[in-house]
Protein backbone atom coordinates (compact mmCIF):
# COMPACT_ATOMS: atom_id res chain seq x y z
CA UNK A 1 0.00 0.00 0.00
CA UNK A 2 1.39 3.38 -1.02
CA UNK A 3 1.68 6.02 1.71
CA UNK A 4 -0.74 8.94 1.92
CA UNK A 5 1.35 12.01 1.15
CA UNK A 6 -1.42 14.57 1.62
CA UNK A 7 -0.35 15.29 5.21
CA UNK A 8 2.92 16.58 3.74
CA UNK A 9 1.13 19.03 1.48
CA UNK A 10 -1.97 19.24 -0.71
CA UNK A 11 -0.19 21.38 -3.30
CA UNK A 12 3.00 19.39 -4.00
CA UNK A 13 4.50 21.80 -6.51
CA UNK A 14 4.60 24.60 -3.93
CA UNK A 15 5.67 22.38 -1.01
CA UNK A 16 9.38 21.98 -0.42
CA UNK A 17 10.43 18.84 1.46
CA UNK A 18 13.95 18.07 2.65
CA UNK A 19 14.65 14.33 2.65
CA UNK A 20 17.40 12.98 4.90
CA UNK A 21 19.13 10.62 2.45
CA UNK A 22 21.42 8.04 4.06
CA UNK A 23 22.18 6.29 0.78
CA UNK A 24 20.04 3.29 1.73
CA UNK A 25 16.92 1.97 0.06
CA UNK A 26 14.44 3.40 2.59
CA UNK A 27 15.31 7.10 2.39
CA UNK A 28 15.88 6.75 -1.35
CA UNK A 29 12.32 5.46 -1.81
CA UNK A 30 10.99 8.35 0.29
CA UNK A 31 12.77 10.80 -2.01
CA UNK A 32 11.54 8.93 -5.07
CA UNK A 33 7.90 8.84 -3.95
CA UNK A 34 7.88 12.54 -3.12
CA UNK A 35 9.59 13.50 -6.37
CA UNK A 36 7.15 11.36 -8.38
CA UNK A 37 4.22 13.04 -6.59
CA UNK A 38 5.51 16.44 -7.71
CA UNK A 39 6.90 17.81 -4.44
CA UNK A 40 9.85 20.21 -4.46
CA UNK A 41 12.35 17.72 -3.02
CA UNK A 42 15.82 18.54 -1.71
CA UNK A 43 18.08 15.67 -0.66
CA UNK A 44 20.51 16.11 2.24
CA UNK A 45 23.16 13.62 3.36
CA UNK A 46 25.20 14.03 6.52
CA UNK A 47 28.92 13.33 6.66
CA UNK A 48 29.26 12.26 10.27
CA UNK A 49 32.77 10.87 10.68
CA UNK A 50 36.05 10.10 8.91
CA UNK A 51 34.99 8.82 5.51
CA UNK A 52 38.42 7.36 4.75
CA UNK A 53 37.84 4.48 7.16
CA UNK A 54 34.09 4.28 6.61
CA UNK A 55 34.34 3.99 2.84
CA UNK A 56 36.15 0.67 3.20
CA UNK A 57 33.48 -0.89 5.44
CA UNK A 58 30.28 -2.68 4.62
CA UNK A 59 27.18 -2.85 6.77
CA UNK A 60 27.40 0.59 8.36
CA UNK A 61 25.02 3.44 7.69
CA UNK A 62 26.25 6.82 6.49
CA UNK A 63 29.58 5.35 5.32
CA UNK A 64 31.56 6.83 2.43
CA UNK A 65 29.92 4.67 -0.23
CA UNK A 66 26.52 5.71 1.10
CA UNK A 67 27.21 9.35 0.25
CA UNK A 68 27.97 8.38 -3.33
CA UNK A 69 24.82 6.22 -3.45
CA UNK A 70 22.67 9.08 -2.15
CA UNK A 71 24.11 11.44 -4.75
CA UNK A 72 23.51 8.86 -7.49
CA UNK A 73 19.87 8.45 -6.44
CA UNK A 74 19.37 12.23 -6.33
CA UNK A 75 20.86 12.58 -9.82
CA UNK A 76 18.53 9.91 -11.18
CA UNK A 77 15.53 11.60 -9.57
CA UNK A 78 16.60 15.01 -10.82
CA UNK A 79 16.59 16.62 -7.38
CA UNK A 80 19.24 18.84 -5.76
CA UNK A 81 21.47 17.09 -3.24
CA UNK A 82 23.73 18.50 -0.55
CA UNK A 83 26.32 16.83 1.68
CA UNK A 84 26.65 18.55 5.06
CA UNK A 85 29.78 18.15 7.19
CA UNK A 86 28.47 17.38 10.68
CA UNK A 87 31.59 15.51 11.78
CA UNK A 88 32.49 17.77 14.72
CA UNK A 89 28.89 17.88 15.98
CA UNK A 90 28.55 14.11 15.67
CA UNK A 91 31.78 13.51 17.55
CA UNK A 92 30.74 15.77 20.42
CA UNK A 93 27.06 14.81 20.65
CA UNK A 94 27.26 11.09 19.88
CA UNK A 95 30.73 9.51 19.88
CA UNK A 96 32.07 11.28 22.99
CA UNK A 97 28.83 10.61 24.88
CA UNK A 98 28.97 6.96 23.79
CA UNK A 99 32.48 6.58 25.22
CA UNK A 100 31.58 8.47 28.41
CA UNK A 101 28.61 6.18 28.99
CA UNK A 102 30.61 2.98 28.66
CA UNK A 103 33.32 4.39 30.93
CA UNK A 104 30.60 5.06 33.53
CA UNK A 105 29.39 1.45 33.37
CA UNK A 106 26.36 2.12 31.18
CA UNK A 107 25.22 0.41 27.98
CA UNK A 108 24.39 3.38 25.71
CA UNK A 109 22.30 3.61 22.54
CA UNK A 110 24.15 6.00 20.20
CA UNK A 111 21.35 5.92 17.60
CA UNK A 112 19.03 7.66 20.09
CA UNK A 113 21.53 10.47 20.63
CA UNK A 114 22.11 10.76 16.88
CA UNK A 115 18.39 11.02 16.11
CA UNK A 116 17.85 13.44 19.00
CA UNK A 117 20.65 15.80 18.01
CA UNK A 118 22.26 15.90 14.58
CA UNK A 119 19.54 14.07 12.64
CA UNK A 120 16.53 15.92 14.02
CA UNK A 121 17.52 19.01 16.00
CA UNK A 122 20.24 20.18 13.62
CA UNK A 123 18.83 18.82 10.37
CA UNK A 124 15.42 20.35 11.08
CA UNK A 125 17.15 23.71 11.46
CA UNK A 126 18.86 23.13 8.11
CA UNK A 127 15.53 22.21 6.51
CA UNK A 128 14.04 25.45 7.80
CA UNK A 129 16.99 27.40 6.37
CA UNK A 130 16.29 25.75 3.01
CA UNK A 131 12.67 26.90 3.14
CA UNK A 132 11.21 23.42 3.60
CA UNK A 133 7.79 22.80 5.12
CA UNK A 134 8.84 19.45 6.61
CA UNK A 135 11.74 17.02 6.92
CA UNK A 136 11.05 13.47 5.70
CA UNK A 137 13.09 10.38 6.62
CA UNK A 138 13.06 6.67 5.89
CA UNK A 139 12.45 5.58 9.49
CA UNK A 140 9.87 2.88 10.10
CA UNK A 141 7.51 4.76 12.38
CA UNK A 142 4.14 6.36 11.69
CA UNK A 143 3.17 10.01 12.16
CA UNK A 144 -0.48 11.02 12.35
CA UNK A 145 -2.49 14.06 13.40
CA UNK A 146 -4.07 13.81 16.86
CA UNK A 147 -7.57 15.11 17.69
CA UNK A 148 -6.12 18.14 19.48
CA UNK A 149 -4.09 19.18 16.43
CA UNK A 150 -0.72 17.89 17.61
CA UNK A 151 1.09 15.09 15.81
CA UNK A 152 1.52 11.68 17.36
CA UNK A 153 4.13 9.05 16.62
CA UNK A 154 3.04 5.41 16.31
CA UNK A 155 4.69 2.03 15.95
CA UNK A 156 5.27 0.88 12.38
CA UNK A 157 2.97 -1.55 10.62
CA UNK A 158 5.75 -4.14 10.26
CA UNK A 159 6.62 -4.98 13.86
CA UNK A 160 10.13 -6.30 13.25
CA UNK A 161 11.02 -3.08 11.40
CA UNK A 162 9.55 -0.66 13.94
CA UNK A 163 12.04 2.03 14.99
CA UNK A 164 9.90 3.93 17.49
CA UNK A 165 12.16 2.77 20.35
CA UNK A 166 15.04 4.76 18.86
CA UNK A 167 12.87 7.84 18.27
CA UNK A 168 11.43 8.26 21.77
CA UNK A 169 13.44 11.46 22.33
CA UNK A 170 11.67 13.22 19.44
CA UNK A 171 10.03 16.31 20.92
CA UNK A 172 6.51 17.48 20.22
CA UNK A 173 7.88 20.49 18.34
CA UNK A 174 10.05 18.24 16.19
CA UNK A 175 7.20 15.81 15.50
CA UNK A 176 5.20 18.67 13.99
CA UNK A 177 7.86 19.14 11.30
CA UNK A 178 8.75 15.47 10.70
CA UNK A 179 7.16 13.00 8.29
CA UNK A 180 7.78 9.27 8.00
CA UNK A 181 6.13 8.01 4.79
CA UNK A 182 7.23 4.37 5.26
CA UNK A 183 5.52 3.80 8.62
CA UNK A 184 2.64 1.87 7.08
CA UNK A 185 4.71 -0.13 4.59
CA UNK A 186 6.48 -3.48 4.61
CA UNK A 187 10.17 -3.67 3.72
CA UNK A 188 9.46 -6.01 0.81
CA UNK A 189 7.09 -3.43 -0.67
CA UNK A 190 9.68 -0.69 -0.20
CA UNK A 191 12.25 -2.69 -2.15
CA UNK A 192 9.69 -3.38 -4.87
CA UNK A 193 9.01 0.36 -5.09
CA UNK A 194 12.73 1.06 -5.34
CA UNK A 195 12.93 -1.26 -8.34
CA UNK A 196 9.82 0.32 -9.86
CA UNK A 197 11.38 3.77 -9.46
CA UNK A 198 14.59 2.54 -11.09
CA UNK A 199 16.74 3.28 -8.03
CA UNK A 200 20.24 1.74 -8.04
CA UNK A 201 19.98 0.86 -4.32
CA UNK A 202 16.92 -1.40 -4.66
CA UNK A 203 18.92 -4.47 -3.61
CA UNK A 204 21.39 -2.75 -1.30
CA UNK A 205 21.74 -4.59 2.06
CA UNK A 206 20.45 -2.91 5.20
CA UNK A 207 22.95 -1.28 7.54
CA UNK A 208 23.86 -3.44 10.53
CA UNK A 209 26.69 -1.93 12.58
CA UNK A 210 26.90 1.19 14.70
CA UNK A 211 28.09 3.53 11.96
CA UNK A 212 31.25 4.84 13.65
CA UNK A 213 32.39 1.47 15.08
CA UNK A 214 34.84 -0.24 12.67
CA UNK A 215 33.93 -3.90 12.26
CA UNK A 216 31.55 -3.74 15.20
CA UNK A 217 34.42 -3.48 17.73
CA UNK A 218 32.99 -0.78 19.99
CA UNK A 219 35.59 -1.53 22.69
CA UNK A 220 38.37 -0.20 20.45
CA UNK A 221 36.53 3.11 20.07
CA UNK A 222 35.79 3.41 23.79
CA UNK A 223 39.30 2.51 24.95
CA UNK A 224 40.87 4.96 22.50
CA UNK A 225 38.74 7.82 23.84
CA UNK A 226 38.41 6.71 27.48
CA UNK A 227 41.36 4.43 28.38
CA UNK A 228 40.11 4.04 31.95
CA UNK A 229 37.18 1.98 30.66
CA UNK A 230 39.69 -0.77 29.78
CA UNK A 231 41.29 -0.97 33.23
CA UNK A 232 40.99 -4.39 34.89
CA UNK A 233 39.13 -4.91 38.15
CA UNK A 234 37.38 -7.47 40.32
CA UNK A 235 34.41 -9.66 39.48
CA UNK A 236 32.46 -9.79 42.74
CA UNK A 237 29.55 -12.04 43.70
CA UNK A 238 26.55 -10.39 45.36
CA UNK A 239 27.51 -12.24 48.53
CA UNK A 240 30.87 -10.42 48.57
CA UNK A 241 33.16 -13.13 47.20
CA UNK A 242 35.79 -12.05 44.69
CA UNK A 243 35.54 -14.59 41.86
CA UNK A 244 38.11 -13.27 39.41
CA UNK A 245 39.29 -10.33 37.34
CA UNK A 246 37.63 -8.58 34.43
CA UNK A 247 39.12 -6.85 31.35
CA UNK A 248 37.48 -3.44 31.86
CA UNK A 249 33.90 -2.38 32.55
CA UNK A 250 33.28 -1.51 28.90
CA UNK A 251 33.23 -5.22 28.02
CA UNK A 252 30.18 -5.99 30.20
CA UNK A 253 26.48 -5.26 30.33
CA UNK A 254 23.64 -6.15 32.66
CA UNK A 255 22.32 -9.65 31.98
CA UNK A 256 25.55 -10.88 30.36
CA UNK A 257 26.45 -14.51 31.05
CA UNK A 258 29.01 -15.47 28.42
CA UNK A 259 32.56 -14.19 28.37
CA UNK A 260 32.88 -13.56 32.12
CA UNK A 261 36.06 -15.64 32.38
CA UNK A 262 35.07 -17.31 35.65
CA UNK A 263 34.16 -20.91 36.46
CA UNK A 264 31.37 -21.55 38.97
CA UNK A 265 29.03 -24.47 39.72
CA UNK A 266 25.95 -22.38 38.96
CA UNK A 267 25.30 -19.96 36.05
CA UNK A 268 26.08 -16.36 36.99
CA UNK A 269 25.06 -13.15 35.27
CA UNK A 270 26.23 -9.54 35.41
CA UNK A 271 23.75 -7.80 37.72
CA UNK A 272 25.54 -4.48 38.33
CA UNK A 273 28.57 -2.50 37.21
CA UNK A 274 30.35 -0.10 39.57
CA UNK A 275 32.70 1.86 37.32
CA UNK A 276 34.05 4.01 40.15
CA UNK A 277 35.29 0.89 41.99
CA UNK A 278 36.03 -0.95 38.74
CA UNK A 279 33.80 -3.80 39.91
CA UNK A 280 31.59 -6.10 37.87
CA UNK A 281 29.03 -7.72 40.16
CA UNK A 282 27.49 -11.08 39.34
CA UNK A 283 24.67 -13.17 40.75
CA UNK A 284 22.04 -15.78 39.92
CA UNK A 285 19.42 -15.19 37.24
CA UNK A 286 16.74 -14.27 39.77
CA UNK A 287 18.86 -11.25 40.74
CA UNK A 288 18.16 -9.80 37.29
CA UNK A 289 14.43 -9.45 37.95
CA UNK A 290 13.47 -5.76 38.14
CA UNK A 291 10.18 -4.19 39.25
CA UNK A 292 10.98 -0.46 39.32
CA UNK A 293 13.00 1.83 37.04
CA UNK A 294 14.36 5.33 37.62
CA UNK A 295 14.96 7.54 34.59
CA UNK A 296 16.72 10.70 33.52
CA UNK A 297 16.36 12.96 30.46
CA UNK A 298 12.68 12.05 30.09
CA UNK A 299 10.89 13.15 26.93
CA UNK A 300 7.10 13.10 27.36
CA UNK A 301 4.59 13.07 24.49
CA UNK A 302 1.43 12.35 26.47
CA UNK A 303 -1.85 14.24 26.54
CA UNK A 304 -1.44 15.55 30.10
CA UNK A 305 1.69 16.85 31.88
CA UNK A 306 4.06 14.08 32.96
CA UNK A 307 3.76 14.74 36.70
CA UNK A 308 -0.04 14.69 36.38
CA UNK A 309 0.19 11.32 34.64
CA UNK A 310 2.41 10.05 37.46
CA UNK A 311 0.07 11.42 40.14
CA UNK A 312 -2.82 9.60 38.43
CA UNK A 313 -0.68 6.44 38.26
CA UNK A 314 -1.32 6.20 34.54
CA UNK A 315 -1.08 2.72 33.02
CA UNK A 316 1.27 2.50 30.06
CA UNK A 317 3.34 -0.04 28.17
CA UNK A 318 7.13 0.11 28.08
CA UNK A 319 10.04 -1.39 26.19
CA UNK A 320 13.39 -1.65 27.99
CA UNK A 321 15.21 -3.16 25.00
CA UNK A 322 14.56 -2.51 21.32
CA UNK A 323 14.05 -6.21 20.58
CA UNK A 324 11.54 -6.87 23.37
CA UNK A 325 7.77 -6.49 23.07
CA UNK A 326 5.98 -3.78 25.07
CA UNK A 327 5.10 -4.87 28.60
CA UNK A 328 2.52 -3.43 31.05
CA UNK A 329 3.78 -0.73 33.41
CA UNK A 330 2.61 2.20 35.49
CA UNK A 331 3.87 5.76 35.91
CA UNK A 332 4.46 6.75 39.55
CA UNK A 333 6.37 9.31 41.60
CA UNK A 334 9.17 8.23 43.92
CA UNK A 335 9.80 9.50 47.45
CA UNK A 336 11.42 12.65 46.04
CA UNK A 337 8.53 13.30 43.67
CA UNK A 338 10.46 12.29 40.54
CA UNK A 339 8.79 10.18 37.83
CA UNK A 340 9.44 6.45 38.08
CA UNK A 341 8.18 3.37 36.25
CA UNK A 342 6.69 0.30 37.92
CA UNK A 343 6.97 -2.84 35.79
CA UNK A 344 3.77 -4.75 36.48
CA UNK A 345 5.11 -8.08 35.21
CA UNK A 346 8.79 -7.45 35.97
CA UNK A 347 11.69 -7.50 33.53
CA UNK A 348 15.14 -9.10 33.41
CA UNK A 349 18.41 -7.52 32.39
CA UNK A 350 17.42 -3.86 32.70
CA UNK A 351 20.65 -2.00 31.94
CA UNK A 352 21.49 1.59 32.92
CA UNK A 353 22.16 3.58 29.77
CA UNK A 354 19.48 1.79 27.78
CA UNK A 355 16.10 3.41 27.14
CA UNK A 356 12.77 2.80 28.81
CA UNK A 357 10.29 3.79 26.10
CA UNK A 358 6.64 4.58 26.85
CA UNK A 359 3.61 3.52 24.81
CA UNK A 360 -0.05 4.42 25.27
CA UNK A 361 -2.10 1.66 26.92
CA UNK A 362 -5.38 2.98 25.52
CA UNK A 363 -4.11 2.49 21.95
CA UNK A 364 -2.90 -1.04 22.61
CA UNK A 365 0.72 0.15 22.85
CA UNK A 366 0.54 1.63 19.34
CA UNK A 367 1.22 5.28 20.17
CA UNK A 368 4.64 6.45 21.35
CA UNK A 369 4.53 8.51 24.55
CA UNK A 370 8.25 9.23 24.93
CA UNK A 371 10.71 7.70 27.35
CA UNK A 372 13.97 8.25 29.17
CA UNK A 373 17.43 6.89 29.94
CA UNK A 374 17.55 4.19 32.62
CA UNK A 375 19.73 5.14 35.59
CA UNK A 376 18.29 2.96 38.34
CA UNK A 377 16.75 -0.51 38.54
CA UNK A 378 15.25 -2.03 41.69
CA UNK A 379 14.02 -5.51 42.57
CA UNK A 380 11.47 -5.90 45.36
CA UNK A 381 12.90 -2.86 47.13
CA UNK A 382 16.49 -4.02 46.72
CA UNK A 383 18.74 -1.67 44.81
CA UNK A 384 20.59 -3.39 41.97
CA UNK A 385 22.09 -0.72 39.76
CA UNK A 386 22.36 3.04 39.80
CA UNK A 387 24.52 5.71 38.24
CA UNK A 388 24.52 9.30 37.12
CA UNK A 389 24.60 9.96 33.40
CA UNK A 390 27.89 11.54 32.44
From Swiss-Prot:
<dbReference type="Pfam" id="PF20259">
    <property type="entry name" value="tRNA_Me_trans_M"/>
</dbReference>
<dbReference type="GO" id="GO:0005737">
    <property type="term" value="C:cytoplasm"/>
</dbReference>
<dbReference type="InterPro" id="IPR014729">
    <property type="entry name" value="Rossmann-like_a/b/a_fold"/>
</dbReference>
<feature type="region of interest" description="Interaction with tRNA">
    <location>
        <begin position="161"/>
        <end position="163"/>
    </location>
</feature>
<feature type="site" description="Interaction with tRNA">
    <location>
        <position position="354"/>
    </location>
</feature>
<dbReference type="GO" id="GO:0000049">
    <property type="term" value="F:tRNA binding"/>
</dbReference>
<dbReference type="GO" id="GO:0005524">
    <property type="term" value="F:ATP binding"/>
</dbReference>
<keyword id="KW-0808">Transferase</keyword>
<feature type="binding site">
    <location>
        <position position="138"/>
    </location>
    <ligand>
        <name>ATP</name>
    </ligand>
</feature>
<dbReference type="InterPro" id="IPR046885">
    <property type="entry name" value="MnmA-like_C"/>
</dbReference>
<keyword id="KW-0547">Nucleotide-binding</keyword>
<dbReference type="InterPro" id="IPR046884">
    <property type="entry name" value="MnmA-like_central"/>
</dbReference>
<dbReference type="InterPro" id="IPR023382">
    <property type="entry name" value="MnmA-like_central_sf"/>
</dbReference>
<feature type="active site" description="Nucleophile">
    <location>
        <position position="114"/>
    </location>
</feature>
<dbReference type="InterPro" id="IPR004506">
    <property type="entry name" value="MnmA-like"/>
</dbReference>
<dbReference type="Pfam" id="PF20258">
    <property type="entry name" value="tRNA_Me_trans_C"/>
</dbReference>
<keyword id="KW-0067">ATP-binding</keyword>
<dbReference type="Pfam" id="PF03054">
    <property type="entry name" value="tRNA_Me_trans"/>
</dbReference>
<feature type="binding site">
    <location>
        <begin position="20"/>
        <end position="27"/>
    </location>
    <ligand>
        <name>ATP</name>
    </ligand>
</feature>
<feature type="active site" description="Cysteine persulfide intermediate">
    <location>
        <position position="211"/>
    </location>
</feature>
<keyword id="KW-0820">tRNA-binding</keyword>
<dbReference type="GO" id="GO:0002143">
    <property type="term" value="P:tRNA wobble position uridine thiolation"/>
</dbReference>
<keyword id="KW-0963">Cytoplasm</keyword>
<comment type="function">
    <text>Catalyzes the 2-thiolation of uridine at the wobble position (U34) of tRNA, leading to the formation of s(2)U34.</text>
</comment>
<feature type="binding site">
    <location>
        <position position="46"/>
    </location>
    <ligand>
        <name>ATP</name>
    </ligand>
</feature>
<feature type="disulfide bond" description="Alternate">
    <location>
        <begin position="114"/>
        <end position="211"/>
    </location>
</feature>
<dbReference type="GO" id="GO:0103016">
    <property type="term" value="F:tRNA-uridine 2-sulfurtransferase activity"/>
</dbReference>
<protein>
    <recommendedName>
        <fullName>tRNA-specific 2-thiouridylase MnmA</fullName>
        <ecNumber>2.8.1.13</ecNumber>
    </recommendedName>
</protein>
<keyword id="KW-0694">RNA-binding</keyword>
<keyword id="KW-1015">Disulfide bond</keyword>
<comment type="similarity">
    <text>Belongs to the MnmA/TRMU family.</text>
</comment>
<keyword id="KW-0819">tRNA processing</keyword>
<feature type="site" description="Interaction with tRNA">
    <location>
        <position position="139"/>
    </location>
</feature>
Amino acid sequence: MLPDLTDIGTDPASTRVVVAMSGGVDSSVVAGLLARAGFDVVGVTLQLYDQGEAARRKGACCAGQDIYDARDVADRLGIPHYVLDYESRFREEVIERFADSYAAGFTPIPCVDCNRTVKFRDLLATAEDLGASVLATGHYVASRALPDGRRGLFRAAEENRDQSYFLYATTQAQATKLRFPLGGMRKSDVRALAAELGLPVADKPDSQDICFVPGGDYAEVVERLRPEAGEAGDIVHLDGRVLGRHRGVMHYTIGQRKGLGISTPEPLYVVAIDAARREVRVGPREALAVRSIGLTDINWLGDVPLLDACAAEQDIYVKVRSTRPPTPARLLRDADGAPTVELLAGEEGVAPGQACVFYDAASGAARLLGGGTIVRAERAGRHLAAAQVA
